[in-house]
Amino acid sequence: MIATGHGGAERRTTAGDGTARPVVARTIGELRAARAALTGPVAFVPTMGALHDGHRSLLRIARHHGDHVVVSIFVNPLQFGPAEDFDRYPRTLDADLAMCAAEGVDLVFVPPAAEMYPSEPQVRVSAGPLGERFEGSVRPGHFDGVLTVVAKLFQLVQPDVAVFGRKDAQQLALVRRMVADLNLPVQIIAAPTFREPDGLAASSRNRYLTDADRAQARALPTALTTAAAVAAAGGPPSEMIEMARKVLADAAVTLDYVAVVDEATFDEIDDAEWSQRGEGLCIAAIRVGGTRLIDNMPMRKAD
């Protein structure tokens, strides 16, 4: 059962099976009132909903880093381009709240778009040059939208730590850069990529895949694993990329990009630089059917 508390937020209650349900706040006022009642360190997991086992792993990591866990569920219109999947992005609020309850989340913020953006925002966070390459070049303005909503959520939730998945590596790098550049008092925790049994990185968009699409999509983690084997054997980035491209071409997927980069700056690492450093991140984006997927894997030269 969920009861209404002060300010209209649905307060924390216990279901018939003994599971404690989180407070659900739908307005900024409700969020602030519920947040004020939390004492001790707060860990925050921002999401767009359609929660899956990858999100579950984030919630469990958050629990280790705070006395309280706060989750936001908000499909942010600012980070979608005009031809992207905002309208069809999966929305599964009941299931999302059930997962939050099962994982002991204390507070869930579920604002409508009009609550976050009552008018067209005139001031936004710019992702700068880092936000213009790779994902940013394919999705112009995407990272400005991501950083704007994350900055707003940090301001509203006031977390001590926030947990982001490594699957969205460029987003993680940009959030870290924003926190450093704007002196935001939030520690960013990077969570390992959660992989499904067939190796595909968990993603809300995986549910778009048909069985045939999924069989093709498995080439993405295979390509990255192949590149990692090249790195471990002493091969340079050019060979890693060549071998990854071959795996993806054999699977007949559409390749947006594959590159070996520095995980903090997303500068590409060439063969000469690799010989000095011996580590980096192989990133790739593909399209299968009507679905776009991204993934990455660390590359390390054998000792």
Swiss-Prot record:
The keyword rRNA-binding does not apply. The active site is at residue 55. ATP binds at residues 48-55, 165-168, 202-205. Beta-alanine binds at residue 79. Keywords: ATP-binding, Cytoplasm, Ligase, Nucleotide-binding, Pantothenate biosynthesis. The keyword Disulfide bond does not apply. GO terms for molecular function: ATP binding; pantoate-beta-alanine ligase activity. It comes from the Bacteria. This is Pantothenate synthetase.
